[in-house]
């Protein structure tokens, strides 16, 4: 896993903006708006993945944007429901990173994406309103929810 622990701290403090017919912005922690939003979308769980690593299958990837394009291309070939995301990672500079929000995807598939994208974690939003990190399988702790 190549992302640094500092990136994980930034990830936890970021604000996530899901773009779509029912847009929403939220941070990590308990958020009843997330529970209502997921209920309106008839979804139980959402995972936000903001690629910062390079996909294992791309030997000539040059930027994190290459990882995002790879993930979007893969998602377009599935029947999974997903929306684009902006992760606002810095309040001071307005820095944003692109990502995706995928609904009701099996946990094992999220773990595969984390491994293929060389990501430390994904953001997991649940129907109870909890927004937390789901760690890469190699660094997973007992605090993660399956």
Give the positions of each predicted feature.
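Short alpha-helix boundary/capping motifs
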Residues: 65, 103-104
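Short, low-order "capping/linker" segments at domain edges
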Residues: 99, 134-146
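A general structural signal for short secondary-structure junctions and capping/turn motifs
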Residues: 38-39, 92, 112-115
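N-terminal, charge-rich interaction modules
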Residues: 1-73
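Short, compact, well-ordered microdomains
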Residues: 96-97, 104-130
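Short, intrinsically disordered low-complexity segments
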Residues: 77-103
């Amino acid at each position: 896993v190549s992302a640094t622990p500092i990136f994980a701290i930034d990830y936890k403090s970021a604000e996530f903006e899901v773009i779509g017919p029912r847009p929403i912005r939220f941070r990590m922690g308990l958020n009843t708006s997330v529970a209502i939003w997921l209920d309106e979308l008839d979804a139980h769980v959402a995972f936000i993945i903001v690629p910062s690593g390079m996909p294992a299958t791309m030997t000539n990837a040059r930027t994190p944007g290459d990882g995002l394009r790879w993930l979007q291309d893969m998602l377009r070939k599935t029947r999974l429901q997903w929306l684009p995301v902006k992760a606002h990672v810095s309040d001071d500079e307005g820095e944003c990173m692109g990502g995706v929000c995928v609904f009701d995807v099996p946990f094992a598939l999220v773990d595969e994406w984390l491994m293929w994208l060389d990501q430390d974690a994904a953001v997991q939003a649940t129907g109870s309103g909890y927004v937390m990190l789901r760690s890469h399988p190699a660094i997973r702790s007992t605090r993660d929810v399956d």
